[in-house]
């Protein structure tokens, strides 16, 4: 899948994936992932569910055959993902209460002062089980260590008793430990740092820019440089990850320490500076950046979600923005709308690529799925019409750009998608300057969603929908 970071490659790919795919009908779900054009699929191993509720007096926690572990659902998930031709990405998420060192550990999903030795043992067991050499199970190469450690919702403590931020320092120790465990099983495994939440919330959440600076022992707001010391020899991971949920459109930047779509460039610049300073120990010369979660709730079904036409347009623009700044992989959260279970619509997750049906097989695709599968944008300006897109299968070939004139689609220009399916170019035309009309791309008989010449400007909108009623 990922052979080298985009910045050093002759071509710049944008691999696509779907995150948090899990369901009883997982084989059907994976066919829907494939239908969305994605090659990567992501799910958590919930450590607190796999491990026993109490720490056994005598056991082998690093042994993949330890009988007190319950791997049944993960085994099936991995088998079905690989059988479907997908590349699995497993995230170790949460922790059992006995692996947490806080006096009061309230949740398996938001570990509090997690014991690095316990994390190492479980990560070793998981990586050995899915090494390709255990019990006939397929290999998993991509491993992510925890979830959103800059958010108090998923990682504690964020601050010590004096109010000093400590989560980045704590996570550095855990990440280095996780890296050692995963690489100790197979040095060609790929370790992904936990995806960071996008927005700073005083007293609860540390903004991802600040968190990353502290994690990597860097300083500066725009011109990044190393802080004093050697950062304990550096931070060990292969790929960095962000969840740039955006409280607006694809150009929205947020605050100084936030990372939303419009400010992805800041995080790329920080990682580049950290690479140059030798702060990151990675198998790549330039650290790749993945978006492992991103989406907006759609309307319908969320009455406070983005209208479907806008979400569809913004999804294509989001993928273009990601590719332009050098993102290597873009995951949509998630495959199907999650059941509200009595929660308000702005809290429930209705950002799926599919409307949820009675069964996975009965799910229906949303319009946004087709923009995710075959993203295409066309922006008019005084020098012509600039276009960009990615073919549905991420492969090369001839792409015909068409424009809508007098109610009919007419050929405008033929382009060539490169070996990873990216095509772009400029059509020297005045078409679209009056903000009328639309363009689309056609690849091997498949049409992209038409992209209207009338732009949709940025406006405030919560990613999971506005409160309604």
Show where each model-derived region lies.
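Secretory targeting and sorting signals
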Residues: 1-9
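Boundary/entry segment of secreted carbohydrate-active catalytic domains
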Residues: 9-46
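Hydrophobic faces of well-ordered beta-strands that scaffold small-molecule active sites
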Residues: 14-20, 39-43, 88-92, 143-145, ...
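Noncatalytic carbohydrate-binding groove/subsite architecture in carbohydrate-active enzymes
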Residues: 27, 31, 120, 124-134, ...
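Substrate-binding cleft and catalytic face of glycoside hydrolase catalytic domains
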Residues: 36-206, 247
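Surface-exposed intrinsically disordered loops and tails
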Residues: 53-68, 99-114, 136-137, 152, ...
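Aromatic-rich peripheral "rim/lid" segments of glycoside hydrolase catalytic domains that contact
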Residues: 58-60, 144, 149, 154, ...
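Short strand-edge motifs at loop-to-beta-strand transitions and within beta-strands
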Residues: 421-425
């Amino acid at each position: 899948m990922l052979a080298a970071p985009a910045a050093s490659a002759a071509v710049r790919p944008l691999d696509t994936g779907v995150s948090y795919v899990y369901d009883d009908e997982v084989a059907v779900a994976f066919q829907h992932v494939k239908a969305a054009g994605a090659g990567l699929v992501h799910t958590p191993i919930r450590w607190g569910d796999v491990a026993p509720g109490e720490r056994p007096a005598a056991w082998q926690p690093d042994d993949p055959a330890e009988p007190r572990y319950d791997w049944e659902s993960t085994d099936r998930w991995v088998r079905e993902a690989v059988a479907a031709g997908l590349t699995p990405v497993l995230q170790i998420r949460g922790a059992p209460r006995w692996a947490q060192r806080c006096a009061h550990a309230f949740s398996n999903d938001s570990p509090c002062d997690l014991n690095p030795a316990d994390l190492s043992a479980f990560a070793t067991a998981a990586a050995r089980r899915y090494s390709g050499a255990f019990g006939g199970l397929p290999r998993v190469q991509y491993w992510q260590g925890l979830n959103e450690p800059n958010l108090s919702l998923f990682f504690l403590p964020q601050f010590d008793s004096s109010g000093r931020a400590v989560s980045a320092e704590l996570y550095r120790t855990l990440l280095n430990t996780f890296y050692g465990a995963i690489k100790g099983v197979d040095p060609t495994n790929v370790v992904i740092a936990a995806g960071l939440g996008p927005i700073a919330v005083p007293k609860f959440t540390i903004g991802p820019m600040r968190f990353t600076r502290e994690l990597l022992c860097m300083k500066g707001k725009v011109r990044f440089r190393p802080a004093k010391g050697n950062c304990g020899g550096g931070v060990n991971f292969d790929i960095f990850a962000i969840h740039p949920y955006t409280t607006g459109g694809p150009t929205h930047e947020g605050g100084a320490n936030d990372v939303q779509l419009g400010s992805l460039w800041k995080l790329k610049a920080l990682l580049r500076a950290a690479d140059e300073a030798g702060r990151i120990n990675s198998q790549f010369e330039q650290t790749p950046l993945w978006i492992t979660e991103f989406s907006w709730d759609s309307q319908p079904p969320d009455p406070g979600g983005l209208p479907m036409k806008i979400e569809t347009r913004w999804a294509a623009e989001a993928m273009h923005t990601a590719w332009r700044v050098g993102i290597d992989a873009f995951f949509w959260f998630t495959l199907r709308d999650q059941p509200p279970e009595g929660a308000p619509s702005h809290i429930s997750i209705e950002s799926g690529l599919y409307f949820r049906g009675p069964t996975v097989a009965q799910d229906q695709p949303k319009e946004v799925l087709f923009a995710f599968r075959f993203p295409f944008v066309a922006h008019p300006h005084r020098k012509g019409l600039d276009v960009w897109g990615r073919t549905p299968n991420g492969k090369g070939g001839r792409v015909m750009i068409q424009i809508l004139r007098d109610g009919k689609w007419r050929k405008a220009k033929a382009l060539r998608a490169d070996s990873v399916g990216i095509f772009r170019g400029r059509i020297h035309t005045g078409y679209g300057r009056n903000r009328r009309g639309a363009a689309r791309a056609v690849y091997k008989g498949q049409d992209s969603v038409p992209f209207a010449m009338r732009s949709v400007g940025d406006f405030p909108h919560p990613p999971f929908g506005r409160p309604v009623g």
